[in-house]
Amino acid sequence: MAFKDTGKTPVEPEVAIHRIRITLTSRNVKSLEKVCADLIRGAKEKNLKVKGPVRMPTKTLRITTGKTPCGEGSKTWDRFQMRIHKRLIDLHSPSEIVKQITSISIEPGVEVEVTIADA
């Protein structure tokens, strides 16, 4: 018995493409930019649609304290501040590929948050 050629090509299973947002936060700008560049380079090697890095406004946390522990003496103050930098990267790809991209070595002090939504 011979098989008939119907002219149809075999149907490949559709891979669900998600909109993936990667949020990076850090106190150190150099390490944050290095991780951003590594993520984007990995995504471009896989021919993914990339938007970003979007530089969000820097949050500056300030604390002002009196220098003397007892409150006596001259009124001198210490001012401390911590700057938190944030970057957003948007990808359009299947979630399996994102697992491969985000498996790169991430600098210490950089926090990574991955949010997946349907495209």
Swiss-Prot record:
Per the record, residues carrying N6-acetyllysine are: 34, 75
| Quaternary structure and interacting proteins, as annotated | Component of the 40S small ribosomal subunit.
Which keywords are on file for this protein?
Acetylation, Cytoplasm, Isopeptide bond, Phosphoprotein, Ribonucleoprotein, Ribosomal protein, Ubl conjugation
Q: Tell me, in one coarse class, where this protein mainly resides.
A: cytoplasm
> According to its UniProt record, where is this protein located?
Cytoplasm
Kindly provide the PTM information from the record: Polyubiquitinated by ZNF598 via 'Lys-63'-linked ubiquitin chains when a ribosome has stalled, initiating the ribosome quality control (RQC) pathway to degrade the potentially detrimental aberrant nascent polypeptide. Deubiquitinated by OTUD3 and USP21, antagonizing ZNF598 activity.
Name of the protein in its database record = Small ribosomal subunit protein uS10
> Which residues are recorded as modified (Phosphothreonine)?
9
| One CC-aspect GO term | small ribosomal subunit
N6-succinyllysine found at: 8
N-acetylalanine occurs at which residues? 2
Q: Which family does it belong to?
A: Belongs to the universal ribosomal protein uS10 family.
Q: Which GO terms describe its molecular function?
A: RNA binding; structural constituent of ribosome
What does the record give as the function of this protein?
A: Component of the small ribosomal subunit. The ribosome is a large ribonucleoprotein complex responsible for the synthesis of proteins in the cell.
Which GO BP terms sit in this record? translation
Q: Where is this cross-link: Glycyl lysine isopeptide (Lys-Gly) (interchain with G-Cter in ubiquitin)?
A: 4, 8
Q: What is the lineage of its organism?
A: Eukaryota, Metazoa, Chordata, Craniata, Vertebrata
Family annotation (InterPro entries): Ribosomal_uS10, Ribosomal_uS10_CS, Ribosomal_uS10_dom, Ribosomal_uS10_dom_sf, Ribosomal_uS10_euk/arc
